[in-house]
Regions:
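Histidine/acidic-residue-rich catalytic or RNA/ligand-binding cores of hydrolases
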Residues: 1-5, 63-71, 90-102, 122-124
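Extended substrate/RNA-proximal surfaces in nucleic-acid metabolism proteins
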Residues: 1-76
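Short acidic/histidine-rich active-site segments
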Residues: 110-124
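Helix C-cap/helix->beta junction micro-motif
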Residues: 49, 108-109
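Active-site beta-loop-alpha junctions enriched in small/polar residues
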Residues: 8, 58-60, 86-88, 118-122
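Hydrophobic faces of well-ordered beta-strands that scaffold small-molecule active sites
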Residues: 53-56, 81-83, 113-117
Length: 124
């Protein structure tokens, strides 16, 4: 869930402390949730449920340029990459990525290529 705070005093000590604490807790949660063991188990659970494991909008969250990372996920059973996603919306945080870059990576490793539910325009 995302909440926006309009008209706030950004120097408010209570708000600053809350944000700092939340940031630390979030970082720990991310490390715990996305540890290697959990990703491997999640992919296995998806397969056991009859599904395909696809990494959603990979360039928004991961250093996809690192072959080692992609190969590791494939070794865990990754089936595909969400290729068709409006990456242009995230130009500020994504330096090199377009759908075509992700498509090339999927082709290189024989992964299926998908689009997400938030893809509303194929003019990527």
């Amino acid at each position: 869930m995302h909440l926006l705070g309009y008209g706030i005093d950004v120097n408010n000590k209570e708000l600053q402390q809350f944000c700092a604490k939340s940031k630390r807790e979030t970082e720990l949660d991310i490390i715990r949730i996305f540890s290697t063991r959990n990703i491997k188990n999640l992919i296995q659970a998806i397969h056991n449920a009859g599904g395909l494991a696809v990494l959603a909008h990979p360039a928004c969250c991961w250093a996809l340029s690192h072959d080692r990372f992609v190969k590791k996920l494939i070794s865990y059973g990754l089936d595909g990459l969400e290729v068709y996603y409006p990456y242009k919306r995230h130009r500020g945080i994504i330096k090199f990525t377009t759908a075509r870059n992700i498509e090339k990576i999927a082709d290189k490793y024989g992964l299926i290529k998908t689009g997400g539910t938030d893809l509303h325009d194929y003019n990527l």
